Amino acid sequence: MKKFDKLGLDNIKEIFHNLSYDELNAHEKANNEGLSTDNDTFCVDTGIFTGRSPKDKYFVKQDPSSKYIAWGKVNQPITKELFDKLLTKAKQELSGKKIYVQDVFCGASLQSRKAVRFVTEIAWQAHFVKNMFIRPSQEELENFKADFIVYNACKCINEDYKQDGLNSEVFVIFNVEENIAVIGGTWYGGEMKKGIFSMMNYWLPLENKLSMHCSANVGEKDDVALFFGLSGTGKTTLSTDPKRRLIGDDEHGWDDEGVFNFEGGCYAKTINLNPEHEPEIYGAIKRNALLENVVLRADKSVDYADASKTENTRVSYPIEHIENHEPSLKAGHPKNIIFLSADAFGILPPVSKLSKEQAMYYFLSGYTAKVAGTERGITEPQATFSACFGEPFMPLHPTVYARLLGEKIEKHEVNVYLVNTGWSGGSYSVGKRMSIKATRACINAILDGSITKCEFENFEVFDLAIPKALEGVESVLLNPINTWLDKNAYIATRDKLAHMFIQNFKRYEDVKEGIEFSKFGPKI
């Protein structure tokens, strides 16, 4: 117990330190924390919070970190005094209890990884952490020294939030100087995963290493590909390829040695999961995996179509559950980078080759367009711009990440492409979704290098290089103007989308890099 004195908890009844999967499973059942499915996968409910609470995320504003953090709606400031008050409250919640302590690594690169200790009173949260992060060897556990500690006091709420000037009784706070995070009021597992991701996005760029919200895989010739894209663009589906080993599906770093996964597991959406379309994910859901917010039938089988608790049903599992993964969780420098956008306006080409400067522009734009599946009366697509394809998790100014990406693209001569997995032949009410077959053909041409042998033409207004012909893709699809029956509607929609890009990019023009990169976007 003595080695845990530094945690600052009083009268701890018992500490369960680095339990095995079987031990965690036994605790989950004994604590009545959830149910087991028909194939012995444990299944939990995360309560009223079935997603992250971005409005309740704060960074302590103090030097020296305050001069690096890009303060605003994403990175909200909180005082050291208020942090201390809420940390004390969280520690009181965890005191006098039996607690679970889980030690893990974030980052598969020995020179870049961070050692993180999680403290919680809920067994399934320790299980989630064990699934999602890199599991140290026995020897590494014996010599484990935490770089960062997360106190997850999910049962603790802040009743004084109004007088404290906060948004709700929930709080997720990061203290960069003291290397501590504290979570209160939300049970959602993703807060722990994305919280440490946010910290990696603070630490690594200051060491001149790039942190990225992307998936990554590696081919038989050790050629690495990165896939960036917001939710719903096909990032997980397209990076899962029987001919290529999965490095990771969500969070990666890029240092002098190459690309490495931050995680040791995957956190996949399960809504409408179909074993025919996504056999790897379906097959990964077995003992040691952890299902969240799904609905069980009477026979304990999972009804993946049931969204009555949330659309955001999830499963976490160790990456070993994916047969075709890269065991080292790392590889060399990328050969190809693919930006995925599901353009519901039907304007972006199925595939375009980007210059280094255009890559900076589209990386900073982080564009996709969503269709309103849940809101009635909305017929217009909704443009979404998320800096670096992961704005909620980026504590530094987005141009910091863009500059690093540009330097690495140049140094390692990486090819960069923009792939539209969205609509063709019109916006989403008129046109149709790009077929997965056509998108796969574009991806395959990028990965096998055949696209580099194509003849390219210029795509007007956006000034993109698009192939005139590509094996496996109907030529008519390659330039969107050819797929629209109403050419006037096409021109009007194209100019409207270009204007959205231009307007969005103005927010980066507070720094000189932003002004420089703005020259490489659309021009009306």
UniProtKB/Swiss-Prot annotation:
Biological process (GO), any one: gluconeogenesis
Note on how the cofactor is bound: Binds 1 Mn(2+) ion per subunit.
Enzyme Commission number(s) of this protein: 4.1.1.49
Pathway(s) of this molecule: Carbohydrate biosynthesis; gluconeogenesis
Keyword ATP-binding: yes
Keyword Cytoplasm among record annotations: yes
UniProt: ATP binding residues: 194, 213, 229-237, 278, 314, 439
Residues reported to bind Mn(2+): 194, 213, 250
NCBIfam families referenced in this protein's UniProt entry, alphabetically: pckA, PRK09344.1-1, PRK09344.1-2, PRK09344.1-3
Protein name from the UniProt record: Phosphoenolpyruvate carboxykinase (ATP)
Name of the encoding gene: pckA
